Amino acid sequence: MSDYVVIGKITKTHGLFGSVKVLPLTNALEVFQKLENVFIKNDAQSNTHRLQIEEIRKAGKGFLIKFSGIDDEERARKIVGLSLAVRVTDLPKPKSPNEYYYYELLNVEVLDQSGNFIGRVEDIIQTGSNEVAVVKNGSFEMLIPVIHDYIIKFEKRKRLVVKVPEWI
């Protein structure tokens, strides 16, 4: 699925006419507003299936989406738990060179300010205030806030240079 980026997760059905609630897995919410089609994917499998969006609207921290061909709660229930993805080429371009998508951080090597290898970004988790990179090196794990105070330099898909918090 390297040509695709997961942008959300279908969490539950909504109503009787096939709408579903989607939890965004990106902070670039404008991606959702421009969608006409998405690909659904079971995380355990590599195949994708394209769905056309009939209607999309913001609802709390997520979105309510109505797909063409999914017209009742029973059909909607079959896609609950699946991931929503878009083609990488369909993502809006970042507004500045200092902006990036979280998928671009995954698996990159992380170095401290002195050039010492810390580990690789295994995951990005969302907290209440900001996102945090989960950096692992064997059994060693470090959580680094993904904010300008800690990110010194990012070379897309290669390496991330970070300021290691003083308390570590």
UniProtKB/Swiss-Prot annotation:
Q: Which GO terms describe its molecular function?
A: ribosome binding
Its Gene Ontology cellular component terms are: cytoplasm; ribosome
What InterPro entries has UniProt attached to this entry?
PRC_barrel-like_sf (IPR011033), PRC_RimM (IPR056792), RimM (IPR011961), RimM_N (IPR002676), RimM_N_sf (IPR036976), Transl_B-barrel_sf (IPR009000)
Q: Where is the PRC barrel domain?
A: 97-168
GN (gene name)? rimM
Q: What protein does this entry describe?
A: Ribosome maturation factor RimM
Q: Is Chloroplast set as a keyword in this record? A: no
Q: Name one GO biological process term.
A: ribosomal small subunit biogenesis
Alphabetically ordered keywords of this record = Chaperone, Cytoplasm, Ribosome biogenesis, rRNA processing
Give the domain note.
The PRC barrel domain binds ribosomal protein uS19.
Q: How does it assemble?
A: Binds ribosomal protein uS19.
> Could you tell me where this protein is found in the cell?
Cytoplasm
Q: Which domain of life is it from?
A: Bacteria
Role played: An accessory protein needed during the final step in the assembly of 30S ribosomal subunit, possibly for assembly of the head region. Essential for efficient processing of 16S rRNA. May be needed both before and after RbfA during the maturation of 16S rRNA. It has affinity for free ribosomal 30S subunits but not for 70S ribosomes.
Task: Give the protein family.
Answer: Belongs to the RimM family.
